[in-house]
Regions:
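Metal-cofactor-binding active-site regions of metalloenzymes
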Residues: 2-225, 232-239, 243-247, 251, ...
Length: 284
């Protein structure tokens, strides 16, 4: 994500590392919503798993692809999709070497495959440190090295968004925000709130107040803000309204249920909040 950008900027990104545009190209695409846990090619995950000595439940590569790939036959809801990430991709990416390569490969793949020259990539660093076994700063530094390498080699512009977790204790989410602020001049450009919407925290007044303080601190430090909400009936249009009015976010992740709420649509329009719509995943 790039910093909260005023309307006159090119795109409503959160916070920009103003990297030079690619010379000679007529245009490039922009990607605002991409997760490290869902964007690494299966063959890269397979290699990373073996490099780290993970004991996988399958030995054949194509069985592994099926294991880490979401499809309508086995993913019936958001919880099913998140389970794939939590059980396998996040675990495989939980080392400095693995997260560095993952970040690099995503940026490189998106540019080579679709000429995405400006991209914001998000992940929860605390879900990449094996519950505290890995040092959090080492994980973050490694991710930033992957970003730097991709930007150097491909001339792209990019930044990292740190995801808070709905299921985390407040003190853990506060640590993530502190790390985002610490590395805001190195390529961390914003924060997000992600996780199962069954934990509809934005609809619980005391939870909203707690997160409002966290998001305010991030904004004051110059970070952009976005929230996953309005993707499922658990949060619906009410979640979108709460995120905009109470958390004062710059953007909304998904937010497709706002389409069923005239009030939510009015709030989005009045406040100029962008929806990070993901047609492929939401249609599936």
């Amino acid at each position: 994500m790039e910093q909260p950008m005023p309307a006159e900027r090119l795109v409503p990104s959160l916070r920009s590392r103003e990297r030079s545009p690619i010379p000679g190209l007529p245009h490039t695409l922009t990607e605002l919503h991409l997760h490290v846990g869902g964007a690494v090619a299966p063959h890269v995950l397979f290699e990373l798993a073996h490099e780290q000595g993970f004991k996988l439940p399958v030995r054949d590569y194509f069985d592994f692809v099926d294991l880490v790939t979401s499809n309508p036959d086995k993913v019936r809801n958001l919880e099913d999709y998140l389970r794939i990430m939590h059980e396998w991709t996040e675990k495989i990416q939980s080392s400095p070497a693995a997260i560095e390569r993952s970040v690099y490969e995503i940026f490189a793949k998106e540019y080579r495959g679709s000429r995405v020259g400006r991209m914001e990539l998000r992940f929860n660093p605390m879900k990449r440190n094996l519950g505290g076994e890995r040092d959090l700063d080492h994980i973050i530094h490694a991710a930033l090295r992957g970003l730097d390498r991709a930007c150097l080699e491909y001339g792209i512009r990019g930044g990292l968004i740190f995801c808070l977790a709905r299921e985390f204790r407040a003190d853990l989410n506060e640590i993530i925000v502190e790390k985002a602020i610490k590395y805001r001049d190195r390529g961390v450009i914003g924060i997000d709130l992600a996780g199962t919407e069954a934990h509809a925290l934005e609809l619980v007044p005391e939870s909203v107040e707690r997160f409002a303080g966290i998001f305010a601190r991030a904004r004051e430090a110059g970070l952009g803000t976005t929230v996953h909400t309005g993707e499922t009936p658990h949060t619906a249009g009410e979640g979108v309204i709460a995120a905009v009015r109470r958390l004062k976010v710059d953007r909304i992740g998904h937010g497709i249920r706002a389409a069923y709420s005239p009030e939510a649509m009015r709030v989005l329009s009045d406040e100029g909040v962008t929806l990070e719509v993901c047609p492929t995943s939401n249609l599936h």
